[in-house]
Amino acid sequence: RTLLCTSDTDRSAFGTGHFRIIDTDRLPGKAQSEQQSHSSDEERNAYIIFTSGSTGEPKGVPITRANLNAFYRAYSSLDWNLDEHDRMLQMFELTFDVSVVSLLYPLTLGAAVYTVGHQDVKHFKVFELLEKYQLTFATVTPSLLQLLSPYFDEINLPSLKYLGVSAEASQTELLERFRKSVPNATFINLY
């Protein structure tokens, strides 16, 4: 296990487990990077996402640190009541922008992230994870809900606090039918 932290991190919060601690303030090249202006740092790429967009032609789109920060701030401004005790689902391909927030946001809270392996049948594995680990937060697509709609009567997820619906337009009727399966969840349209 490796723990990345800065010099001002209170390390007592991590217990006495066996961690390899890396102080990012002491990494080689740190002094040089601190000489760069804040604005130029924000303009640096955080990652590149590949999308076909409306053209159907795959292209790489650079996402700057400022873009990522804005996306993260917008996501966290939704006033979730989430913390390190929550268990969150990340089911999206890493080429989809929601995957970045679905992975990074929970980790910044200290929450657990559960992912669907590429070898699994995604739509069934999602609900297996939600049920088995009593996940508290999930973002899914309306297509996934539509595919599983014949099984709504068998799905009971009382631990789910938030259900984000993303990637495409949602049908109100479909969401209302699914509401019985997630009686304690607040629905959030993230499309």
Give the ranges of each region predicted by the language model:
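Motif- and composition-driven signal specific to adenylation
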Residues: 19, 30-191
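Structural core segment of the AMP-binding/adenylate-forming
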Residues: 1-27
